[in-house]
Every structure is written in structure tokens, then in C-alpha cells.
């Protein structure tokens, strides 16, 4: 998945000071009982882990469904490549343009989270990619597809690192790994779900005089538009401003966070931070690792439905179902 390509962007927030540690925090255990703590944390988990994971399912689907569209209804003559008259070179360009815009806009999208409150910025990102994803269903040619695919990458680029950055306002460093792991794992399941949805939507080919691939993008883009409204009115921004928390719960969260936790009111990003960041060898080793991971992992994901179909022992519908297996075992 493309969301994870430049996770290092969010690390600039912390590079100007020593890594946060639970030792730097005020331990509120003596002030608050266990039932109170669990209840307060569950409220935050519902939104920052549960809601974001739900959104992430459709974010992954809205980017991975292009590979499913490559073979949907191929036998019926209503395939996307045939209807849009895309040759192999043009198809490759429409596939890769998403990653180019993603690469360009991910750093700036992430930094803008410091200028806008999280709920409002997430609303903009989710709504934008939802509209762009549904707009694919109306594309009539190569140029239109290039434009809309570029726009989808631009909108989706900031989501994954912004989620990690938003979580840092709320959780102790020791609490972050398990929540990030759950959030990321959901993305793998959504890739499997994408194949199942493509299989089902393929049977809608011709309904309302629309090809199956147009229904695919239309139906899979709509949930993001709905979820963007939920994000605007439901997501908690910062502990000190969250409407869902009581005053006592706000105090609890503020007391338990590290001194290096980012603030919702002021930022600590500057050029000194960048110098410290790029002097850290971990940045380069992680970048090399992620580059190798992306070349192998993302390349296979984009081509997998087509590869399965071209093996020659199944229909396009069954190929969509067989695509589920590889993600289910990951």
C-alpha cells in the first residue's frame, strides 16, 4: 500500500529532542483508578484506532481497486481497457501516476496537519479522495484517467502519516506500537476485501447501462465521502479540546503524555529539526528497507489479479476471488 512509503515524514516532529519515553511522563496511576483509566482510553481508541481503521479499509480499496478493474468483465467486452481504448503503455502510466503524485504531496500534506486541526484536515483529505475515486466511474479516456488518478494520489498521500501524527497527541510511546500494528493489519484485510467486492460488483455489468468497472469505482468511492462527514464532526482533535471527554478525563490525558508529545497549539518543526533528522542513520536504513519492500510488495499487488487470470485456468470472476487468498495469509 502506498500510504506507508514515506512514514519518516512524521518523525520530524520528534527529531529535535530525545526520543519520547514513558519515564518523562507524569504517572497518574496514584490519582485515577483502573476503571476510570480504561474507560477514558477506550473512548479515544474508538476514534483513533477504530474509526481510522475503518477509513483505512476504504482508503486501501480506493487505491487497490484499479488492479481489480484491469480484468473485471473482460469476457463480456466491457473491460475498462477496451472501453477507454488504453494500450499497455497508457495503462502503465495511469497505474503509476498515482505513486508520483503520492510522492510529491505526502510531505506537504503531513505538515499541513500542524496548520489545521486534525478533524478538519482529515475531512478534507477523506472527502477529496472519495470524490476523486467516484469520479473515475465517469472517465471517458486516457487524459481524464491520468488527471483523476493523479488527484487521488494527491488526496490520499497525507492520510497514513497524519494518522500516526494524530495518535501521538493522545498515546504514550509504549502504547503506540500495538495500535499502529492493528491499524496497518486492517489494510491487509482490506486488500482481500477488495477482491471480494470486485467479484460481486462484476455481476452488475450493464445495470443502468453502466459497465461493471464503472460500478466498481462508484460504489467503492462513496463510503469515503460519508466517512469524511463523520470525521469532521466526530474526531477528537487534542486532549484539551475533545468534546467527548469530561474535564477530569482531559486532565488525565494531559498528565500521562510525554514532555515531547506534539502540541495542538504550537509546533516545533524547523530547519534545525531537519538537520538532526538527516544526521540520523536510521532514516537511511529504514528508507532502503522500505524501498525494497515497496518494489516487491506494491508491484505484485498491482499486477496480481491480471497475473492470476493470465495463468489461464479460471475466469475473471474467479480470479478476483483467488486474489483474496494471497492477502488472507499475509
Question: How should these model regions be labeled?
Answer:
Residues 67, 272-330:
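Extracytoplasmic gate region of multi-pass secondary transporters
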Residues 93-111, 324-330:
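Central cavity-lining transmembrane alpha-helices of secondary-active solute carriers
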Residues 148-188, 201:
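Cytoplasmic helix-loop-helix junction between adjacent transmembrane helices
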Residues 2, 173-187, 196, 206-276:
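Central mid-sequence intracellular linker of multi-pass
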Residues 47-88, 105, 109, 194-198, ...:
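Extracytoplasmic
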Residues 62, 85, 116-117, 138-144, ...:
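Helix-breaking motifs and short loop linkers at transmembrane-helix boundaries and internal kinks
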Residues 103-143:
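Conserved MFS/SLC helix-loop-helix module at the cytosolic interface between two early adjacent transmembrane helices
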Residues 1-71, 82:
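Cytosolic juxtamembrane N-terminal segment immediately preceding the first transmembrane helix
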Amino acid at each position: 500500500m502506498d500510504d506507508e512509503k514515506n512514514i519518516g515524514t512524521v518523525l520530524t516532529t520528534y527529531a529535535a529532542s530525545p526520543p519520547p519515553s514513558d519515564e518523562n511522563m507524569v504517572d497518574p496511576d496514584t490519582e485515577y483508578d483502573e476503571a476510570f483509566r480504561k474507560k477514558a482510553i477506550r473512548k479515544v481508541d474508538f476514534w483513533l484506532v477504530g474509526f481510522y481503521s475503518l477509513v483505512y479499509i476504504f482508503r486501501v480499496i480506493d487505491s487497490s481497486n484499479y488492479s481489480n478493474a484491469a480484468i473485471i468483465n473482460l469476457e463480456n467486452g466491457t473491460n475498462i481497457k477496451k472501453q477507454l481504448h488504453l494500450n499497455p503503455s497508457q495503462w502503465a502510466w495511469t497505474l503509476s501516476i498515482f505513486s508520483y503524485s503520492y510522492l510529491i504531496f505526502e510531505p506537504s500534506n503531513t505538515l499541513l496537519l500542524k496548520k489545521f486541526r486534525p478533524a478538519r484536515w482529515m475531512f478534507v483529505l477523506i472527502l477529496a479522495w472519495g470524490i476523486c475515486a467516484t469520479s473515475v466511474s465517469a472517465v471517458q479516456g486516457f487524459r481524464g484517467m491520468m488527471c483523476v488518478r493523479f488527484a487521488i494520489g494527491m488526496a490520499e498521500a497525507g492520510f497514513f502519516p497524519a494518522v500516526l501524527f494524530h495518535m501521538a497527541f493522545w498515546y504514550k510511546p509504549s502504547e503506540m506500537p500495538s495500535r499502529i500494528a492493528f491499524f496497518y493489519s486492517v489494510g491487509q484485510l482490506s486488500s482481500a476485501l477488495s477482491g471480494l467486492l470486485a467479484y460481486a460488483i462484476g455481476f452488475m455489468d450493464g445495470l443502468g447501462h453502466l459497465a461493471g468497472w464503472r460500478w466498481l469505482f462508484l460504489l467503492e468511492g462513496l463510503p469515503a465521502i460519508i466517512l469524511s462527514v463523520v470525521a469532521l464532526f466526530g474526531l477528537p482533535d487534542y486532549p484539551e479540546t475533545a468534546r467527548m471527554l469530561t474535564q477530569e478525563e482531559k486532565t488525565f490525558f494531559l498528565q500521562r503524555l510525554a514532555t515531547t508529545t506534539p502540541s495542538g497549539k504550537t509546533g516545533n518543526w524547523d530547519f534545525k529539526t531537519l538537520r538532526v533528522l538527516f544526521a540520523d542513520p536510521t532514516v537511511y536504513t529504514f528508507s532502503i528497507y522500505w524501498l525494497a519492500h515497496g518494489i516487491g510488495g506494491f508491484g505484485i499487488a498491482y499486477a496480481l489479479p491480471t497475473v492470476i487470470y493470465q495463468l489461464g485456468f479460471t475466469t475473471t470472476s474467479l480470479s478476483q476471488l483467488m486474489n483474496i487468498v494471497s492477502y488472507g495469509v499475509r
